[in-house]
Amino acid sequence: MGTSVSINTKHPKERVWFLRDLNREIDNCPFCKAKGNKLQHILGGGAIDNPDYFFVLINPTYRNITSDPNHRGLRIPFMGVSNFWRVLVEAGFLPREIYQTTEKRLWNCTDIHTVANTLKEVGLYLTNLVKCCANDASPPSVEAVKHHTEILMEEIQIVEPKLIVAFGLLPFQALTGQSIRLSDHLNRARRGDLDFYETILNGSVAYKVFPTFFPVGRGKPKESVELLKYLRK
């Protein structure tokens, strides 16, 4: 078992500087350069100072409007993709008023900032296990997962969240080194038993991890919402 998380050990400005350095490293990804991938990496974003929740998804696709090579500004998961935000609203993590922005067919820069500011207000940070943006929904390579897991661990250490939520088995396994059946995890939650796990030691600190189903695409959004609701009780 790891030691408890040390809260407020970094000044907020320090976190910004550390994340900027990390993001520069991400943007120099050797995998994207080797493949000639022109899509921009999708970085983490939201509340960066000990957020209540640190949500980890798998990998972004071209559907994220901030992946466009011509985009300048924030690059946060699921920008312009409405179905993910419905899951967070239905689970009680975001106010329903956010639908005025997230249900738009076409987002603009103001919409991106509206969602980013809402994440800060509610204490959420969003990121992906692999930041490389794909042209389809295919899973990332083993090599990319290994490389980006190290980056994710740095990101966690900078942000110092109170709880990590892993959406899907791939980020859960990368974070904890364990494998579980999410259906069993859900059944235990239905009986009132919430299971939490710990990250592989990140320095001297282990962070709590709560797994849930991937919320969009080939995932299980209804089951993901159900587990997230149990978590918020």
Residues of each region from the PLM?
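A polyanion-binding, active-site-adjacent surface
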Residues: G2-R188, D193-D195, S204-L231
